[in-house]
Amino acid sequence: MIYVGGVQFLDESSSFSLSSSSQGSSLLVDVMSHPVITLASDSFKNLEEKNVSFDESDSESSTKDRYVYIFQREFAVVNPALVDFVGTDEATTCVGLVIRNRKSGMTSVAHMDSPEIVDLGISQMLLLVLQDDVDAELDVHMVGGYEDVDIKNADGVGDYAKPEGYSFPLCCKLVETLQKRRENFHIQTLFILGHNTKLDSQANTCPIFNGCLVNTSTGAILPASFNRTSRCPDEIVRRIRVSSSFEDSSWKGKLLDTYDTKTDRFIIAPCRWTMRLIEYVWELNQLTDEEILTNCSTSPSAEGPDFVNSLRRNWGYLLKYPEWSKTFPRRQPRVFERTVDGHWKKC
């Protein structure tokens, strides 16, 4: 169930004979328009974005603090005794979801990219966050999911009434699922859709922020961006798993396992890819940069400057190593442990 401002949020739409999608839409509209949520969004909007970089030439570079970074469709549960900060970015039509146990400080971050992974995904996130205490008080933050299309007022409910585009259905599903579950979810930040949308110089809608960083000790959240030095470890393989997981039935409806909470190690669970994916990648790699942006992004006008380059790096790896067993010998995970200087090394 959802709480806003310490008060249980009553879903009035559930008492009416509305379809499930209409109920979800109405609930999302009501929560987003709550004065507490609106004020929190205005405050978040005025925060300075934290640029996380481990480049030695960068004045903001810092590996003294212990970071965990999450890619698309991944999740991690971190212990504040072992990790200082956990975050994600590149969430345009995706949503960075944070769930933190107020008592223990155990924090889970997921990069949700589809309504189809929300139900199982939230269950995965909560497994270690709850620590067998189903009555725990949980703080929740959502960042990303900008308004990627013009949402029409189809039935008089509000600006977000008609589910279109990619962001809206995902945001609806997230809020609806939290409301239906028995755990106590205190919504602190809902920086999504209209709250997280601006116009660029060409009058295209784009996100104000597409990432966030959580201080595990305090629970404070900041808008954040990362780069190639801080999106680690094993960036390319972890990115490839997102595409290949669609062909691997063992990952259906699930978030990707990434990080071991107890040992503070990245354990990149194996994932298979087929020759069909390799052939498809070869065809995509023949496209121009503009064609790649148009065909491979849910939000072409909102992607970062390194979007196409990242895809070409991923495809280059797949074309070089078309057999998944070369990356995951004997179907064993790729394991990385933290070094004394804050970086990661492969075990």
UniProtKB/Swiss-Prot annotation:
Q: Which UniProt keywords apply?
A: Hydrolase
* Leader sequence residues: none
Q: Which Pfam families match?
A: N_Asn_amidohyd
Disulfide bond residue pairs = none
Tell me where on the tree of life, at the top rank, the source sits: Eukaryota
Give any GO molecular function from the UniProt entry: protein-N-terminal asparagine amidohydrolase activity
Q: Known catalysed reaction(s)?
A: N-terminal L-asparaginyl-[protein] + H2O + H(+) = N-terminal L-aspartyl-[protein] + NH4(+)
Q: What is its EC number?
A: 3.5.1.121
What PANTHER family does the entry give?
N-TERMINAL ASPARAGINE AMIDOHYDROLASE (PTHR12498), PROTEIN N-TERMINAL ASPARAGINE AMIDOHYDROLASE (PTHR12498:SF0)
Q: What does this protein do?
A: N-terminal asparagine deamidase that mediates deamidation of N-terminal asparagine residues to aspartate. Required for the ubiquitin-dependent turnover of intracellular proteins that initiate with Met-Asn. These proteins are acetylated on the retained initiator methionine and can subsequently be modified by the removal of N-acetyl methionine by acylaminoacid hydrolase (AAH). Conversion of the resulting N-terminal asparagine to aspartate by NTAN1 renders the protein susceptible to arginylation, polyubiquitination and degradation as specified by the N-end rule.
Protein name per Swiss-Prot or TrEMBL: Protein N-terminal asparagine amidohydrolase
Name the source organism: Arabidopsis thaliana (Mouse-ear cress)
The gene for this chain is NTAN1
